[in-house]
């Protein structure tokens, strides 16, 4: 994660965020109604930066696993073992385009352990690479790639060590994918409340119109008047609380959104942010329970995303109907 690409992704997110240094800490009393929206905006920004770092780490680990598989193929000269794990890696772990975002519904645990245990058993009982005098004691590659230069025989301990390393990397990628799915789910949950804009008339009456809009105009007017009385009654209490907050240390106040001359992505750019607390046994247990539990009954029809709908329409001529069924577009 020390490559410039990861920090370039974070800098791009910071540029498009529109949040400058210190603008959250310098909010005045007139901007107090903007604090909840700024907090929500910063939270979404930090989640987007976390997803960007996870995607970069997944791509790096994916390349590393393919390098390990190539090294194993270089030593055991078995196309079958290389193909088994390469197919599992390509289907379940290799990052793909947005219409094919990873989900937790895939059988990650079974694919990881079955493929790796099969390769370990094959290395122990069936694979014994040997070189003849015709090749001067050196191994040649298998069916697809002809590697030359590996000295025979190959130690069984080295094969098991690389097999175990591939298994650990697969489990780390599984934990990252699960964390990415959870983070993306948090990002997609947005508030449906409609906020009304504060105007000059409401400001003169002492009424805050940033409360969610009511369905009834009569009830809304009554609530506005009530808000005005409450605001004037609690003016002294609010001033005292603001005075106490200004005198308090920023670290002692849990509601302080940010310090002066700081940015929400400073933790990511400085390398102090934790994108995942990885526990291999916890990841295996949670994913196994998630895979074995029955899926909940669908209460509403499936509505695909815009990218998925465009891909199905352009590539296969299909569309998802109101009942959730895939239908062919009749021209």
From Swiss-Prot:
Organism: Aspergillus fumigatus (strain ATCC MYA-4609 / CBS 101355 / FGSC A1100 / Af293)
InterPro entries: Dsc4-like (IPR038967), DUF1746 (IPR013715)
PANTHER family named in the record: DSC E3 UBIQUITIN LIGASE COMPLEX SUBUNIT 4 (PTHR39405:SF1)
A cellular component term, taken from the record's GO annotations: endoplasmic reticulum membrane
Pathway stated in the Swiss-Prot or TrEMBL entry: Protein modification; protein ubiquitination
Keyword Endoplasmic reticulum: yes
Entry's Gene Ontology BP terms: SREBP signaling pathway
Name of the featured protein: DSC E3 ubiquitin ligase complex subunit D
Phenotype of the disrupted gene, per the record: Impairs growth on solid media under hypoxia and leads to triazole susceptibility. Impairs virulence in a murine model of invasive pulmonary aspergillosis (IPA).
Keyword Transmembrane (UniProt): yes
Record's function text: Component of the DSC E3 ubiquitin ligase complex which is required for the srbA transcriptional activator proteolytic cleavage to release the soluble transcription factor from the membrane in low oxygen or sterol conditions. Required for growth during hypoxia and triazole drug susceptibility, as well as for virulence in a murine model of invasive pulmonary aspergillosis (IPA).
Membrane topology: Multi-pass membrane protein
UniProt-annotated stretches for the region Disordered: 188-225
Residues bearing carbohydrate: 26
Gene: dscD
């Amino acid at each position: 994660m020390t490559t410039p690409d990861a920090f370039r992704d974070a800098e791009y997110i910071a540029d498009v965020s529109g949040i400058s240094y210190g603008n959250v800490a310098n909010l005045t009393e007139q901007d107090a109604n903007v604090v909840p929206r700024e907090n929500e905006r910063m939270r979404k920004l930090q989640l987007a930066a976390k997803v960007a770092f996870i995607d970069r780490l997944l791509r790096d680990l994916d390349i590393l696993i393919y390098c390990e598989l190539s090294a194993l193929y270089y030593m055991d000269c078995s196309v079958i073992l290389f193909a088994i794990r390469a197919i599992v890696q390509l289907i379940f772990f290799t990052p793909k385009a947005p219409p094919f975002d990873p989900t937790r519904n895939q059988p990650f645990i079974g694919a990881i352990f079955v493929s790796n245990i099969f390769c370990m058993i094959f290395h122990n009982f069936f694979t014994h690479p040997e070189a003849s005098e015709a090749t001067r004691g050196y191994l040649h590659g298998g069916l697809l790639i002809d590697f030359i230069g590996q000295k025979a025989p190959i130690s069984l301990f080295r094969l098991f060590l690389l097999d175990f390393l591939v298994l650990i990397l697969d489990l780390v990628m599984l934990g990252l994918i699960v964390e990415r799915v959870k983070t993306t789910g948090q990002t997609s949950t947005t508030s449906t409340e409609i906020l009304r804009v504060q105007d000059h008339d409401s400001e003169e009456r002492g009424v805050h119109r940033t409360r969610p809009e009511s369905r009834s105009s009569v009830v809304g007017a009554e609530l506005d008047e009530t808000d005005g009385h409450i605001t004037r009654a609690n003016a002294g209490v609010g001033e005292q609380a603001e005075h106490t907050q200004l005198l308090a240390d920023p670290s002692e106040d849990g509601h302080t959104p940010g310090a002066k001359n700081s940015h929400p992505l400073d933790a990511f750019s400085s390398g102090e942010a934790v994108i995942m607390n990885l526990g291999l046994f916890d990841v295996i247990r949670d994913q196994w329970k998630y895979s074995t539990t029955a899926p909940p009954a669908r209460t509403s029809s499936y509505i695909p995303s815009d990218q998925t709908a465009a891909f199905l329409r352009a590539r296969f001529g299909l569309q998802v109907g109101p009942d959730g069924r895939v239908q062919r577009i009749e021209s």
